[in-house]
C-alpha cells in the first residue's frame, strides 16, 4: 500500500518530529511512504479569509502534487478537511478540475482515521505511563465526523490513563486566521480551554492538530502551567515494542 504524506504547514515548520513519527508508524505497518516535494499549503487561510480565487490556485497545485498518490494521509483533521472541500471550489464548467478534486478528497485521510478505518489497526504496541487528556479539533470532529479512531488508539497505549476533558469539542480559539482577526475573543476561548485542561489534573495534553496544540501550548506556557503537549502520532510512537504492531 502506497501512502503519500501531506505534512501541512504547521507540522512542517514547527513540528517536524510529528511528520517523522507518522512516517515511522506507517512504514512499520507495511506502507510504502513518500513525500511529494511539490506540495504546499492547502489554501485554508485564504479560504477562511474569503480569497476564493487564491484558494483555487492552491487547490490546483495540491491536486497536481498528489495526482499519482494511492492514499494521502495528513496529521491534521483541519487540513484534511480542506482537501475534502476542494471540489466545492469548482463550478460545473470546470468539470475536469472538479473531478480531480473529488478524487483527491476521496483518497485523503486524517492520520488516526487512516490507521483505524483503512489499516484496521488499534494497538500499535505503544507504552507511555502518563495521565492525559485529549483535545479534538473542530474540523476533525464536526466536519469530518472523526471521534472514535483517536479514542480506540489511545485506549491501547499501555500505561496511559486518559481522563475526560470537560467541553472537549469546544474550539480552542485558534481557527487559523480567526485568532488574528479576532484576538480578544480567541484569547478568551483558549483561556477557557486551558481552564478545563487544568481541571482534569492531567500532566499531558494530546491532540490531533498541531495548530490547536501550538495555540494551547502557548497559553499554558504563558500561564506557567507545567503540562506537556504532544500530537497523537508522538504518543503512538512512544516506546513501541518490536513486533508490537
From Swiss-Prot:
Protein name: Lactate utilization protein A 1
Gene that specifies this protein: lutA1
InterPro entries attached to this UniProt entry: Cys_rich_dom, LutA
An example Gene Ontology biological process: lactate metabolic process
One GO molecular-function entry: oxidoreductase activity
Signal peptide region: none
Pfam hit, one: CCG
Source organism per UniProt: Bacillus mycoides (strain KBAB4) (Bacillus weihenstephanensis)
Chain's role: Is involved in L-lactate degradation and allows cells to grow with lactate as the sole carbon source.
GO cellular component term of the entry, any: cytosol
UniProt similarity note: Belongs to the LutA/YkgE family.
